[in-house]
Amino acid sequence: MAEWIVYAVVSALLTGLMPSFLKTGIKKAAPALGAALFSSVVLLFAAGVVAMEARAGEILEIGNETLLYLVLSGALQGVVWLCLSAALIHGNVNRVIPITNLHVCGAFGISVWLFHTTLSVWKLCCILLLLLGTLLLESRPDKGGNGKWALFAFLALFASAAKTLTDMLYLPESVISVSVANAVRTAISTVVLWCAALLGKSLNSAKRITADGWIFLVLAGMAIGVAWLCDSRAALLGDSSYLLPISCTAFPVALLGARIFHKEEMPAGAMFGILLALAGMFGMLLEL
């Protein structure tokens, strides 16, 4: 097996397991504090990668336009993590992730609405497949739920769609490596989230985090950090046109992680929804 495929698969596996790790880590914390702690772990890992690659000097080469992009993208990333944390605290992983997974559809929708971009028949069919699959997954009754998770999941979806659209419209200058862009973006996210935690007076909730919670918080941050590192290695060594389709496997891994770590059950009928959603994602990513 080619080395880049191993990196791509490891990235997808870690990305899929992250929601289950994060839910375990922050279940007794306030959402803002949980997201801030998670982002801090990711930042430490991202900064370590930059130092390991000896690319810290590139930060001084960031132009104003690129910096503006990174600030906007980082702020949106912080909002995504905040809303995702709140959704996972109030709801199950296998209910939250199918909704947040629609961010690519949201990005295309915003692009068509604001910029009047054309939508091919193929892409429209893929979007319909993804929407239908998600509808089947979410058609189960929400036993004991209060509905808050759905509100935060949709907020995370919209913020993630805006971030995806930002990344589609403007990519960092070629002189800036992916690792440096990730580190700067995550630094912005961390600042935004700690400000939210301070303004929300949620720091005291740190006392409620158990020893296991701290361990899983660190694991969640490390999962994203290692996934980013694997992504950059896979892109460097392999065919980038195959990387995004491989990343689709993060979706079923997330649902499997919910079953393993949180005993979240899924009816047999929902499996058809997973297949439809995967087909829609795979088809859309092939056209990117």
What residues fall within each predicted segment?
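Hydrophobic transmembrane alpha-helices of multi-pass small-molecule transport proteins
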Residues: 46, 110, 121-139, 269-288
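Residue-level recognition of pore/gate-forming positions within transmembrane alpha-helices
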Residues: 12, 39-43, 101-105, 127-130, ...
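C-terminal transmembrane-helix exit sites in multi-pass transporters
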Residues: 84, 103-125, 135, 251-272
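Membrane-interface interhelical linkers
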Residues: 1-71, 75, 81-91, 141-154, ...
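Selected transmembrane alpha-helices and immediately adjacent juxtamembrane segments
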Residues: 4, 148-180
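Residues that define the loop-to-transmembrane-helix transition and helix capping
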Residues: 32-33, 94, 120, 176-179, ...
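Hydrophobic residues within membrane-embedded alpha-helical segments of Major Facilitator Superfamily
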Residues: 14, 21, 76-77, 83, ...
